Every structure is written in C-alpha cells, then in structure tokens.
Regions:
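Domain-scale recognition of soluble eukaryotic interaction modules
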Residues: 92-197
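Compact alpha/beta protein-protein interaction domains typified by the UBC
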Residues: 1-121
Length: 197
C-alpha cells in the first residue's frame, strides 16, 4: 500500500461516525458486552398475575414504593437485578440484596417468561437502552417467586409482603424486608461476571 493510499484510508476511517454520547448519571458500569445501571428508589406501578388469587385478585396492579435497584444486561440477553438500600448512587462497595420481586432468581437472574426483552443488542444511546430495559421489567407481569431462598424478610412471606404493598400499608419501601446476599456490586460485576454466579 502506498503512502497516499494509507493517508486516504486514514482520512476515511477518521471521518467515520464514532459511537458515543452522553453518559447518564445512573450508568454504573459498561464494557463491550455488559452494562449496569441504577434505578433510584421511587414509587412505580407494578403488575401481578397470580393464578391462586394470593394477592386479592387473579390480576392486580398498583403504584407502590420500590427500593433502589441495580440492573445488569448483557449483549447475550442475560439480565439481572439486585436491590440496594438508601437513596445514594451505588459504588463498587455497595452491598447487594435480593431483589424482592417475583420472577427473580437468587442469582438476580430475571425470568423472561412474559417479558418483551429489548431487541437490537446494544444499539442506540445508553439512555435509550436503559429506558428500554426498565420498561421491559416494570411493564411485565410478576407471577410467582423463583428463588430457592427467602425473597423477603417479612412475616407471612412474599405473597403477604406484596399484598400489603399493593394495599398501601407502606408509604416508603420497607428496607428491613430486603434479604442480604453477602456480596457487593464490584464482586458481581468484576470477579464473578454479570451473571452473579
């Protein structure tokens, strides 16, 4: 290849559109295949579809307080969620808790049974991708506990907990109900990978 050809190629490659964009404040971690983000505690709508009517109806939804959450999504559609305490943005040392939701395994893996998982891999802006994953989670129906261990520390268990939440018995999310996992954000993202196991 001549020097002129190298210069032309370099100019064309240099003018090609580069991926990028503003980094949202809630993005916690990103590499070539995984991104993790924080969703601050807030009041959000949640939907349940339980065949036994354990929550007072076969299908029920209400706006309830939620804890802070850390989600991790990978390009292979691996998708996980953990809970965190407090309102501060998580750091590497932040302890993680079992996400108190039905359809979430003890590893944080989210059962994708009725969920419209975002398509397009990691295309689009980071903010758009985060919004798509959040929408997929909060717009789905939660149907049954999936974890082998305790989902919540709550008298009466997970069905009683969510029935009380849906009935408006807690003005703020009761963080005392969160089950500690004995691991930190850095441990699940760095040492063991985004799958937490």
């Amino acid at each position: 290849m001549t020097m002129l050809a190298v210069a032309r190629l370099a100019k064309r490659l240099g003018s090609a559109r580069r991926p990028g964009g503003f980094v949202p404040m809630n993005l916690l971690y990103q590499d070539l295949t995984t991104m993790a983000w924080w969703v601050p505690p807030a009041r959000r709508h949640i939907w349940f579809r339980c065949t036994g009517g354990e929550l007072g109806a076969h299908e029920r939804g209400e706006s309830v307080p939620h804890p802070g959450l850390v989600f991790a999504a990978a390009s292979d559609k691996t998708w996980r969620v953990w809970a965190v305490k407090g309102c501060d943005r998580p750091s590497e040392a932040t302890p993680l808790f079992q996400a108190p939701y039905f359809n979430v395994y003890g590893t944080g893996a989210i059962c994708q049974g009725n969920v419209d998982v975002p398509t397009g891999g990691f295309a689009g802006s980071v903010a758009d991708r985060i919004e798509a994953w959040n929408k997929a989670f909060f717009d789905s129906f939660f149907t049954h506990p999936n974890t082998q261990g305790p989902l919540v520390n709550y008298k009466g268990g997970p069905y009683r907990f969510w029935r009380d939440m849906l009935d408006g018995r807690h003005a703020v999310f009761p963080e005392s109900a969160l089950v500690p996992l004995g691991t930190s954000l850095a441990q699940v993202l760095d040492r063991r990978g985004p799958d937490g196991g």
